[in-house]
Protein backbone atom coordinates (compact mmCIF):
# COMPACT_ATOMS: atom_id res chain seq x y z
CA UNK A 1 0.00 0.00 0.00
CA UNK A 2 2.76 2.44 0.96
CA UNK A 3 4.58 1.66 -2.29
CA UNK A 4 1.42 2.32 -4.32
CA UNK A 5 0.88 5.65 -2.58
CA UNK A 6 4.50 6.63 -3.23
CA UNK A 7 4.19 5.69 -6.91
CA UNK A 8 0.96 7.68 -7.26
CA UNK A 9 2.62 10.68 -5.63
CA UNK A 10 5.52 10.53 -8.10
CA UNK A 11 3.14 10.30 -11.08
CA UNK A 12 1.13 13.29 -9.82
CA UNK A 13 4.32 15.29 -9.38
CA UNK A 14 5.48 14.52 -12.93
CA UNK A 15 2.09 15.44 -14.41
CA UNK A 16 1.81 18.68 -12.43
CA UNK A 17 5.35 19.73 -13.37
CA UNK A 18 4.85 19.08 -17.10
CA UNK A 19 3.18 22.46 -17.86
CA UNK A 20 6.02 24.24 -16.03
CA UNK A 21 8.60 22.30 -18.05
CA UNK A 22 6.78 23.18 -21.29
CA UNK A 23 6.66 26.86 -20.33
CA UNK A 24 10.35 26.84 -19.46
CA UNK A 25 11.16 25.35 -22.85
CA UNK A 26 9.02 27.94 -24.66
CA UNK A 27 10.55 30.73 -22.61
CA UNK A 28 14.06 29.50 -23.42
CA UNK A 29 13.27 29.54 -27.14
CA UNK A 30 11.66 33.00 -26.95
CA UNK A 31 14.55 34.48 -24.96
CA UNK A 32 17.07 32.99 -27.39
CA UNK A 33 15.22 34.48 -30.36
CA UNK A 34 14.88 37.95 -28.89
CA UNK A 35 18.55 37.92 -27.89
CA UNK A 36 19.41 37.23 -31.52
CA UNK A 37 17.10 40.04 -32.67
CA UNK A 38 18.66 42.41 -30.14
CA UNK A 39 22.13 41.55 -31.48
CA UNK A 40 20.92 42.17 -35.04
CA UNK A 41 19.46 45.52 -33.95
CA UNK A 42 22.75 46.51 -32.33
CA UNK A 43 24.64 45.50 -35.45
CA UNK A 44 22.33 47.46 -37.76
CA UNK A 45 22.62 50.56 -35.58
CA UNK A 46 26.40 50.21 -35.25
CA UNK A 47 26.84 49.76 -39.02
CA UNK A 48 24.73 52.84 -39.70
CA UNK A 49 26.55 54.96 -37.10
CA UNK A 50 29.94 53.98 -38.51
CA UNK A 51 28.86 55.38 -41.89
CA UNK A 52 28.25 58.84 -40.39
CA UNK A 53 30.60 61.70 -39.72
CA UNK A 54 31.32 62.48 -36.06
CA UNK A 55 29.29 65.68 -36.16
CA UNK A 56 26.38 63.91 -37.82
CA UNK A 57 26.39 61.31 -35.05
CA UNK A 58 26.41 64.00 -32.38
CA UNK A 59 23.53 65.95 -33.93
CA UNK A 60 21.41 62.87 -34.59
CA UNK A 61 21.92 61.57 -31.07
CA UNK A 62 20.94 64.96 -29.66
CA UNK A 63 17.75 65.01 -31.76
CA UNK A 64 16.87 61.42 -30.85
CA UNK A 65 17.13 62.12 -27.12
CA UNK A 66 14.47 64.81 -27.56
CA UNK A 67 12.18 62.54 -29.59
CA UNK A 68 9.98 59.58 -28.76
CA UNK A 69 9.87 56.12 -30.25
CA UNK A 70 6.59 55.17 -31.88
CA UNK A 71 6.24 52.26 -29.46
CA UNK A 72 6.33 54.62 -26.47
CA UNK A 73 2.53 54.61 -26.81
CA UNK A 74 2.66 51.08 -25.39
CA UNK A 75 2.58 51.47 -21.61
CA UNK A 76 5.50 49.61 -20.06
CA UNK A 77 7.42 49.61 -16.74
CA UNK A 78 9.33 52.85 -16.18
CA UNK A 79 12.29 51.24 -14.41
CA UNK A 80 13.77 47.93 -13.29
CA UNK A 81 11.88 47.99 -9.99
CA UNK A 82 8.50 48.23 -11.73
CA UNK A 83 9.62 45.53 -14.16
CA UNK A 84 10.35 43.16 -11.28
CA UNK A 85 6.98 43.92 -9.68
CA UNK A 86 5.04 43.28 -12.90
CA UNK A 87 3.24 39.98 -13.37
CA UNK A 88 4.41 37.41 -15.90
CA UNK A 89 1.25 37.94 -17.97
CA UNK A 90 1.77 41.72 -18.02
CA UNK A 91 5.39 41.37 -19.16
CA UNK A 92 4.34 38.92 -21.87
CA UNK A 93 1.51 41.18 -23.08
CA UNK A 94 3.81 44.21 -23.30
CA UNK A 95 6.43 42.14 -25.13
CA UNK A 96 3.76 40.95 -27.57
CA UNK A 97 2.71 44.52 -28.30
CA UNK A 98 6.30 45.71 -28.81
CA UNK A 99 7.13 42.87 -31.19
CA UNK A 100 3.88 43.32 -33.12
CA UNK A 101 4.56 47.06 -33.52
CA UNK A 102 7.72 46.24 -35.52
CA UNK A 103 6.32 43.68 -37.95
CA UNK A 104 5.71 46.29 -40.67
CA UNK A 105 8.45 48.88 -39.91
CA UNK A 106 11.10 46.13 -39.81
CA UNK A 107 10.84 45.86 -43.60
CA UNK A 108 12.35 49.32 -43.87
CA UNK A 109 15.31 48.80 -41.56
CA UNK A 110 18.69 49.30 -43.19
CA UNK A 111 22.24 49.74 -42.03
CA UNK A 112 25.30 48.19 -43.59
CA UNK A 113 25.81 44.47 -44.02
CA UNK A 114 23.57 43.14 -41.23
CA UNK A 115 21.10 40.55 -42.60
CA UNK A 116 17.97 42.66 -42.26
CA UNK A 117 15.96 40.20 -44.38
CA UNK A 118 16.06 37.87 -41.37
CA UNK A 119 14.34 40.34 -39.08
CA UNK A 120 10.68 40.27 -40.22
CA UNK A 121 10.30 36.46 -40.17
CA UNK A 122 12.12 36.25 -36.83
CA UNK A 123 9.76 38.86 -35.38
CA UNK A 124 6.77 36.82 -36.58
CA UNK A 125 8.20 33.65 -35.01
CA UNK A 126 8.86 35.47 -31.73
CA UNK A 127 5.34 36.94 -31.73
CA UNK A 128 3.86 33.45 -32.17
CA UNK A 129 5.99 32.10 -29.33
CA UNK A 130 4.97 34.92 -26.98
CA UNK A 131 1.31 34.32 -27.86
CA UNK A 132 1.68 30.66 -26.85
CA UNK A 133 3.22 31.75 -23.55
CA UNK A 134 0.39 34.21 -22.96
CA UNK A 135 -2.19 31.47 -23.53
CA UNK A 136 -0.31 29.16 -21.16
CA UNK A 137 -0.22 31.79 -18.41
CA UNK A 138 -3.80 33.06 -18.72
CA UNK A 139 -6.62 32.01 -16.44
CA UNK A 140 -9.16 29.73 -18.18
CA UNK A 141 -11.72 32.55 -18.14
CA UNK A 142 -9.30 34.79 -20.08
CA UNK A 143 -8.09 32.21 -22.56
CA UNK A 144 -9.89 33.75 -25.53
CA UNK A 145 -9.13 37.38 -24.74
CA UNK A 146 -7.01 39.43 -27.13
CA UNK A 147 -3.46 39.86 -25.80
CA UNK A 148 -2.61 42.61 -28.25
CA UNK A 149 -1.54 45.99 -26.98
CA UNK A 150 -3.54 49.06 -28.07
CA UNK A 151 -3.08 49.97 -31.72
CA UNK A 152 0.18 51.82 -32.16
CA UNK A 153 0.06 54.88 -34.46
CA UNK A 154 1.91 54.49 -37.74
CA UNK A 155 5.32 56.01 -38.37
CA UNK A 156 3.75 59.01 -40.07
CA UNK A 157 5.44 59.94 -43.34
CA UNK A 158 8.54 57.85 -42.69
CA UNK A 159 7.82 55.71 -45.73
CA UNK A 160 7.27 58.67 -48.03
CA UNK A 161 10.04 60.22 -50.12
CA UNK A 162 12.15 62.45 -47.91
CA UNK A 163 15.03 64.85 -48.38
CA UNK A 164 18.53 63.56 -47.67
CA UNK A 165 18.83 65.14 -44.21
CA UNK A 166 15.34 64.13 -43.11
CA UNK A 167 15.83 60.58 -44.40
CA UNK A 168 19.08 60.32 -42.46
CA UNK A 169 17.36 61.41 -39.25
CA UNK A 170 14.42 59.06 -39.71
CA UNK A 171 16.71 56.09 -40.42
CA UNK A 172 18.73 56.85 -37.30
CA UNK A 173 15.56 57.10 -35.20
CA UNK A 174 14.09 53.89 -36.61
CA UNK A 175 17.25 51.88 -35.94
CA UNK A 176 17.73 53.38 -32.47
CA UNK A 177 14.11 52.66 -31.52
CA UNK A 178 14.30 49.10 -32.82
CA UNK A 179 17.42 48.49 -30.71
CA UNK A 180 15.74 50.05 -27.68
CA UNK A 181 12.57 47.96 -28.03
CA UNK A 182 14.39 44.66 -28.57
CA UNK A 183 16.35 45.38 -25.39
CA UNK A 184 13.04 45.93 -23.57
CA UNK A 185 11.55 42.68 -24.85
CA UNK A 186 14.71 40.76 -23.95
CA UNK A 187 14.56 42.17 -20.41
CA UNK A 188 10.84 41.44 -19.94
CA UNK A 189 11.05 37.87 -21.26
CA UNK A 190 14.16 37.14 -19.20
CA UNK A 191 12.47 38.33 -16.00
CA UNK A 192 9.26 36.43 -16.83
CA UNK A 193 11.24 33.24 -17.52
CA UNK A 194 13.10 33.63 -14.23
CA UNK A 195 9.79 33.69 -12.34
CA UNK A 196 9.29 30.01 -13.20
CA UNK A 197 12.28 29.14 -11.01
CA UNK A 198 11.37 30.15 -7.42
CA UNK A 199 14.93 29.61 -6.25
CA UNK A 200 16.40 31.88 -8.93
CA UNK A 201 17.53 35.44 -8.30
CA UNK A 202 15.56 37.59 -10.78
CA UNK A 203 17.12 40.95 -9.89
CA UNK A 204 18.18 43.13 -12.81
Curated annotation (Swiss-Prot):
First-listed, main subcellular location of the protein, grouped into a coarse class: secreted
GO molecular function: growth hormone activity; growth hormone receptor binding; metal ion binding
Matches recorded under SUPFAM superfamilies: 4-helical cytokines (SSF47266)
Signal peptide limits: 1-17
Residue numbers carrying Pyrrolidone carboxylic acid: 18
Keywords per UniProt: Disulfide bond, Hormone, Metal-binding, Pyrrolidone carboxylic acid, Secreted, Signal, Zinc
Residues annotated for Zn(2+) binding in this entry: 36, 186
Name of the gene: gh
Gene3D superfamilies assigned: 1.20.1250.10
Pfam families reported in the protein's UniProt record: Hormone_1 (PF00103)
Localization per record: Secreted
Protein name as annotated: Somatotropin
Family: Belongs to the somatotropin/prolactin family.
Amino acid sequence: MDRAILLLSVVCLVVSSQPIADSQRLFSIAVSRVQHLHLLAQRLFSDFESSLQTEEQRQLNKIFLQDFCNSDYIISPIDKHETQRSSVLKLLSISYGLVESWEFPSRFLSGGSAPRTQISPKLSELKTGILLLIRANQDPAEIFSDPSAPQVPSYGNYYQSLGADESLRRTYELLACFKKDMHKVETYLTVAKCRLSPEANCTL
